[in-house]
Amino acid sequence: MKAFGDEDTIFEDMDVLNPNEQTYQPESLPEREVELDQIHSALRPATMGSTPLNLIVYGQSGQGKTVGIRLKTDQLQEYAADSEMDLTVVHIRCKGMDGSYHVLTHLVKRLREKRFGPGEELPSGHQRKTLLNMVIENLEKVGGTVIVVLDEIDAIGDDDYILYELPRSNPDGVRLSLIGITNDLQFRENLDADVRSSLGEDEVRFEPYDADQLRNILARRAVGALRDTYFEDDVEDYQHLRSEILTDDTIPLAAALGAQDTGDAREAIRLLFRATRFADDRSETTVTEEHVREARDFLETKAIESGIQTLPNQRMLALMAVTYHGIQGNTPVTTTPIYTQYKTFCEYADVNVLSNRRFRDRLNDLADTNVLNKRQGRGRGDENQYSLAVDLDTALENLPKESERLGDVAMVLREQGGVADK
């Protein structure tokens, strides 16, 4: 067994390579100067005694949206402290909140914490209108300029009550600005016209990073995180990176893999972080292309496992039906026998049976998220064929446990597949 403190490491500061924004936030985003200037323009009225503009920030995951807003609101707060400006910024992460009601409860809590300090409880048992009035009351108690940032606002779905009512609330003595951050590029277009009018016209789009930009981002992270890694002539880009830890192809491969899909910087950073950890855990002194490829395979498997574990019931039952045929050695298998087995599982688990068409949609959802492989039918009337995109043991091990919803069905499958229930 290894002893703590006895091992050499290639890390100088591991946190800098951690993709978790709560662990490390960069002090600048050189690739996003245009977008930061647009955010600056929307917030600048606050420095002139006016109300900052409402703003919607768009972009796919890992494009710097949240970090960009935090950098500019932090900068504005520093200005406010120096100029004795009355400014309050409230950040709400909406992921996991399925409507305006939950966003309002968290907003009440955060505003109370701005007034009284940490530890305030979420309000419960109130009507939506009452919660809105509680928000307005707390805004008026806080006073001054208040910027409310709603991150991942698309999580609330079609329930845009807060987006309509809050910008129109006009609390006394408050200059209120609402900033929505979303991964949904069609978010604004899907809102009602009245809601779009309430939010105003300002918007900022974060386009996907390209491979060159990702190389520069990874280079800056590497310099902060790794020993014997630096920029030549103090020029902070990949071309001036010098490292005794990273081989020449390590960062280009991580950047290329990150750029392949959506230009997600977080995914590229996660790849390099995992690759570097593989090398460091084995007491190796260099991080190579092979470490990056190993990291890619590892993270893809972990993502699929996590995706299986969090599937909604109907998708889980569809996956179980395909898994059943995988155990029998019958895959790839057409839709009809999968649907037949799905109905059997629904009856066993006392779950409503979807129509054949809606069931096919669930199979396609699983294929779109790389849980299933899909083979298109060759012509009209030919059914699509499906098989597991992961090995059978991985699928079985990540189905619900015996004590969980659908666990009884999963236990039967694991017994048939020769995998012990854990």
Where are these regions (language model features)?
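Terminal-proximal interaction/regulatory segments of ATP-powered molecular machines
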Residues: P332-K422
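Conserved C-terminal helix/linker of AAA+ ATPases
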Residues: F278-L299
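Conserved catalytic segments around the Walker B and adjacent sensor/switch elements
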Residues: L55-I56, Y79-G96
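Mid-core helix/loop region of P-loop NTP-binding domains shared across ATPases and GTPases
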Residues: K2, G96-V108, R112-E201, F206-I217, ...
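Walker A/P-loop nucleotide-binding motif
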Residues: T51-L71
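A short, basic N-terminal segment
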Residues: M1-L53
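Short alpha-helical segments that sit at the start of domains
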Residues: E300-A321, H325-P332
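Short, hydrophobic-biased segments on the C-terminal half of alpha helices
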Residues: T73, L163, R360-N364
